[in-house]
Amino acid sequence: MVKLSIVLTPQFLSHDQSQFTKELQQHVKSVTCPCEYLRKVINSLAVYRHRETDFGVGVRDHPGQHGKTPSPQKLDNLIIIIIGFLRRYTFNILFCTSCLCVSFLKTIFWSRNGHDGSMDVQQRAWRSNRSRQKGLRSICMHTKKRVSSFRGNKIGLKDVITLRRHVETKVRAKIRKRKVTTKINRHDKINGKRKTARKQKMFQRAQELRRRAEDYHKCKIPPSARKPLCNWVRMAAAEHRHSSGLPYWLYLTAETLKNRMGRQPPPPTQQHSITDNSLSLKTPPECLLTPLPPSVDDNIKECPLAPLPPSPLPPSVDDNLKECLFVPLPPSPLPPSVDDNLKECLFVPLPPSPLPPSVDDNLKTPPLATQEAEVEKPPKPKRWRVDEVEQSPKPKRQREAEAQQLPKPKRRRLSKLRTRHCTQAWAIRINP
C-alpha cells in the first residue's frame, strides 16, 4: 500500500474548499494511468477530519469554523506528490494526446488523394486505365468506372469511399440530366413541333441543310452545273445531224452535262418508221432532265423534251404508202392480147386467185405481185369445190298439199354456174 503525504500551501488554502476539490479532480481525470487510490484521497480531502493519519496530514483547528482544515505544510506535500506522479507518466500522456489530436484532425480534413469530386483525380485515374495495360482492376464507387491499380499507384480505402454529399450531388445531377434529355428527345422528333418560334425555325433550317446534303451526295453535281447561266438552247436538227422535218424543235441542254449524258439514239430507219412513227428513246421520261453517262459519238449533249417525227425513207417494195384509190395505175407491159388497154380500178374487189386451200382463200384483195401475175397470164378456169358452189337454201318441210301446189326448184349444172360466174366477173372488170 502506497502512502502519500500531501502538503497544502497557503495559496491553496485561500481558495474555497469545494473549488479546490474540483480542480484536483479535473487534473487527475486527465491522467490515463490507474491511480484510483490517489483519486480517493483527493475526494476525501474535503471531508477529512482526523489528525495524524497515514498521509501525515496535519490539521489545525481554527476557532469559528465547523470543520477542520489541513495545515499549509501538508498541502505543499500533496502538490509535490502530484507533480512527481505527472513527471513519471509524461510520455504516456503526450502520446495519447497526440493520437487523439491526429484522429480528430483526420475526421475534419478529408484526404486529398481520394475521389472527393475533383475532376483532376478522376481524369488521372481514367487516363491511366486507358493508356496502361495490365494490373488489378477495381470499380470506383464514385465514378462507377474500372480503375487499374499499377505498381506505384496504390489505391486505398480513402480513394474508393467518398463522402455522402458528393454522391448525392452526382445522383441529383444525373437525374436532372436524364429528365432534360427525355424532354428534349420528346420534342425533337421529325414532326418538327416546337414550343417556340425560334426553335421551330432552327429545326426547319436543320432539316433543309440535311436534305441539301443528301441531294448533293446523291447527284454529285459540280458547282458550275448549279449556275443558271450555264444552260442554253440549241436546235434539234443540228444536234441529231439528220433532217427530221422539224428543224426548229428546241432542246434544253447544259454545257456542263457533256460527261453526264448518255448515248443518243440513232436516226430512225425503215424498220423504226414502219413499227413506230416516233423516235424511240431508251431514257425513261422521268430521267430526261438528269445527267447520263458520257457519249462517244456526240460532244454536244442534249436533253430531248419531245420525240422527233421520222425522216423520209428511200423507195422500196415494202413501203406502206397510202395511195388514193381514185387514181388509176399505169399500164404494165403485157403480151399482145385483148387486155392491153384495160385500166384497173381498185374500187371493186377481184375474184380470188388460184391458191392452195388455206385460211387466206376468202381474201378479197390479193397482194400486188399476184395482181401483176394475173395480168400477164390469162386466168385459167378454176375447178370449183362442192362447198364453194352457191347452194340454194333447202326448202322447208311443208305439208303434202302445200308441196304439190308449189313448183319444184330446177336443178342446175355445175358447169353452167361456173361459166356464168366467170362471165359476170370479167364483164365487170372489162367494163368499169
Curated annotation (Swiss-Prot):
Basic and acidic residues: bias regions: 374-402
Question: Where in the sequence does UniProt note compositional bias of the Basic residues kind?
Answer: 408-420
Tell me the protein's name: Nuclear pore complex-interacting protein family member B9
Q: Which InterPro entries match?
A: NPIP, NPIP_N
> Gene encoding this polypeptide?
NPIPB9
What protein family does this chain belong to?
Belongs to the NPIP family.
State the superkingdom. Eukaryota
Positions of the UniProt region annotated as Disordered: 260-280, 353-420
- Give the compositionally biased regions (Polar residues): 270-280
What Pfam families does the record tag this protein with?
A: NPIP
